Amino acid sequence: MFGAFVSHRLWSDSGCTTTCIANSIANYVAFGEQIEFPFKSAQVFIAGPRKAVINIQEEDKAELSKMIAKHNLWVVAHGTYLDVPWSSRSAFVTHFIHQELLICKEVGIKGLVLHLGAVEPELIVEGLKKIKPVEEVVIYLETPHNKHHAYKYSTIEQIKELFLRIRNSRLKHIGLCIDTAHIWSSGVNISGYNDAGQWLRSLENIHSVIPPSHIMFHLNDAATECGSGIDRHASLFEGMIWKSYSHKIKHSGLYCFVEYITRHQCPAILERNLGSSMQLQTALTTEFHTLKSLLK
């Protein structure tokens, strides 16, 4: 279920004021049809991203709900960068996250992505316990990017430890968002097919702890070296993870990720936020044509 991040700044019609997210999704769907890659998923912001402010209006909610149903889209919202329930401001933050979850349910958005912190699993679990759950909406914990912290959640061992604690705490509706650029930045080599395969086989070995029905992906190349700790996305086969495989794409680690995503029907989002809509659509056209060749 491949798709992309839909920024209303880059996707909505000029002059749009009240239904910009729904309008962006309409243009995004039309673009997918134009490049002959019908999108199955999308990611949006309904709040923030840098402030704790809901930015979807009532009229937009109604139109977005219709758009999601009409095109049978799997849509996830990305939480704001302040959505850190294990922080010192957790009382305000957890209330705000609950508001985001309620909006997600109202319009048919399947989940909310939160950035994992580089903190101990027990602190993350305690933070999650403070969030009032909303039925049918999954909180996806996104693998972070860091270099020096003990808890990077880029290794299968640490992911397993965290989700065992989540399961033992009887928390429901908690999933995992694997960002390929982040785990690379945290020191996991997923460049070649065998390298990525080893990591993904280890992930399959803990499906009893975190099932694929609760796993999604941010499918990004990276503009920095493995283990840099820096989060800088690049287009597929244009960054330092997979560029060396651009002429032998089925030997790349990306192909192994595509196989896993297809085998388990996981949503996968390309996160691109370039300077103009033309630049963005040009880059995405190339990337989705490449994905189409990997799916053959």
From Swiss-Prot:
Consistent with its intracellular location, ASFV encodes its own replicative DNA polymerase and three base excision repair enzymes: a class II AP endonuclease, the repair polymerase Pol X, and an ATP-dependent DNA ligase. Zn(2+) 1 binds at H78, E271. It is found in: Host nucleus; Host cytoplasm; Virion. GO terms for biological process: base-excision repair. Induction: Expressed in the early phase of the viral replicative cycle and accumulates at later times. Its EC number is 3.1.21.-. This is Probable AP endonuclease. Belongs to the AP endonuclease 2 family. Endonuclease of the viral base excision repair system that catalyzes DNA cleavage reaction at the apurinic or apyrimidinic sites (AP sites). Cleaves phosphodiester bonds on the 5' side of AP sites. In addition to endonuclease activity, the AP endonuclease has a proofreading 3'-5' exonuclease activity that is considerably more efficient in the elimination of a mismatch than in that of a correctly paired base. Displays 3'-phosphatase and 3'-repair diesterase activities. The single nucleotide gaps generated by the AP endonuclease are filled by the viral repair DNA polymerase X and the DNA ligase. Pfam families: AP_endonuc_2. It comes from the Viruses. Its cofactor is Zn(2+). Zn(2+) 3 binds at H182, D231, H233. GO terms for cellular component: host cell cytoplasm; host cell nucleus; virion component. Disulfide bonds join C16-C20. The lineage of its organism: Viruses, Varidnaviria, Bamfordvirae, Nucleocytoviricota, Pokkesviricetes. SMART domains: AP2Ec. Keywords: Disulfide bond, DNA damage, DNA repair, Early protein, Endonuclease, Exonuclease, Host cytoplasm, Host nucleus, Hydrolase, Metal-binding, Nuclease, Virion, Zinc. The keyword Hydrolase applies. Zn(2+) 2 binds at H115, E142, H218.
